[in-house]
A protein has these predicted regions:
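Core beta-strand-centered patch of the WYL/Sm-like small regulatory domain
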Residues: 1-59, 63-68
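Polybasic (Lys/Arg-rich)
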Residues: 52-143
């Protein structure tokens, strides 16, 4: 798959369970070990590249999760463009929205942090706590 200037090899564990995708940037692969494990396309689970592309930000690996955040920046349309699975759940004010999106991995955290004070994560609680810790660590760099 091609994304953000690079080609990626996307793989799932060979047990047939598509729990989460693993991403490998093709230009960084140095060695491949061939195992004597054969498979046919009939044995592989269905894979929707388009859906994976919509849910993956910056090709960060990880499980699928639903996130909700408040956005008060200048362009909610830019958010909807960047996150193809995003939808406006509620309008909270003249320029404030509650947005929900499904994403794989922690790429969403990196993107949310890049949105400055325009974003407040409200769900899931684990991501809320991760954001608090990251913002506290960032602030400590300036003290």
């Amino acid at each position: 798959m091609f994304s953000d200037f690079y080609f990626y090899l996307i793989a799932f564990l060979p047990d047939g369970k598509m729990v989460k995708p693993y991403y490998f940037r093709v230009d960084r692969i140095k060695q491949i070990t061939e195992h004597r494990c054969n498979f046919t396309f009939d044995d592989t689970p269905d894979f929707d590249e388009g859906l994976l592309r919509q849910r993956s930000l910056f090709m960060w690996p990880g499980g699928l999760r639903t996130v909700r955040f408040e956005f008060s920046g200048p362009s909610v349309q830019a958010v909807l463009d960047k996150l193809p699975t995003a939808k406006i759940i509620e309008r909270l004010g003249p320029k404030k929205y509650l947005i929900e999106a499904e994403t794989y991995g922690d790429g969403i955290k990196m993107w949310l942090l890049s949105q400055r004070s325009w974003v407040k994560v409200v769900y899931p609680e684990t991501l809320v706590e991760d954001m608090k810790k990251e913002i506290t660590a960032m602030l400590a760099l300036y003290n």
